[in-house]
Amino acid sequence: MSNGLKVKKRNGRGTESLNLEKMHKMVEEACKGIAGVSASQVEIQSGIQFYDGITTQEIQEILIKSASDLIDLDHPNYQFVAARLLLFALRKSLYGKMRELPHLESHIMSCTNRDVYDKDIFTKYSKEEIDKANSYIDHERDFLFTYAGLRQVVDKYLVQDRSGGGVYE
């Protein structure tokens, strides 16, 4: 379902019609299993901010802000909705998808190929050590963050391109 607005793709390859159903599914997924929240409220809060030519990244940022604006004493669980929306945006930006996250070795290789990490990292750690570190990673725990907690991790601890604003890990 579309309302006639065009959206610029995150990858920069053209435009498509604003797909409200796709947006709704993402917000529903962010609200899934959380008591006292409503996907409709997040969507209503964000709806008036869309314009022709908006990017998918801007839509994601509007949805995150809309959910975070709903956090108050009576509705504290919107902090988890906003966190999930931020997490979805991070994963999409980093890996191009929200699920099927890469093995740690693949991610390190990607970062060394882009000169984010020093290639010397592979002389410091063996494949077995990287595999062992990967075995400790449980991406489902990412969903335990509150919005404030995840925002702090992103702003303070993730490797970022300070000039372009991109996040590398």
Where do the PLM segments sit?
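Extended catalytic cores of very large enzyme megasubunits
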Residues: M1-E169
